[in-house]
Amino acid sequence: MKRQYFSVLLTVSLLLILTAVPVLAQTYYFSVDEEIVDVYWESDGSMRIEYILVVTNDPSASPFEFVDFGLPNYNYDLSNVYGWINDQPIQHVGKSEYVSPGIELGLQSKAIPPGATGEVKVLIDRVEGVLYDDYDDPSYASAKFSPSWFGSQYVFGKTDLTVTFHLPPGVQPDEPR
């Protein structure tokens, strides 16, 4: 009886050990080789933002499955947000779980594998509430913008960053200050 009990216990223990699946945490570690941001100040006072990110995923990292972008405020509609990975449309566009206010792009089957490089594009069409009164001169408005960035625990290397502001049609070169 003792021998049979020991045999059953050993069999159950081996089954538990052999069928246990280790749970591995996601490790995001990547370089943003290039970030190009075009900010269009529209004549109706809204903003259109276009990003191009060239991302290299570290060989030791998990697949690069999501990318989050911070936005100036909450005055945007997710139906006006479009994304691409390597010029292929991204189906998952949602509210970011990590950046507030912000959006996330789920790369799904198009995730960037460890050691690979990919190009992520996003268009955020129509962010409202981005102009502010200029208290010194009521004929002017003020605006501010900061490009999206990633925490140092996730990113390494240098980034070639270009931010271009496109002013509304009709604004003359000597008018901005």
Question: Where on the chain are the PLM-derived regions?
Answer:
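Bacterial N-terminal signal peptides
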Residues: 9-19
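Lumenal/extracellular ectodomains and adaptor appendage modules
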Residues: 21-177
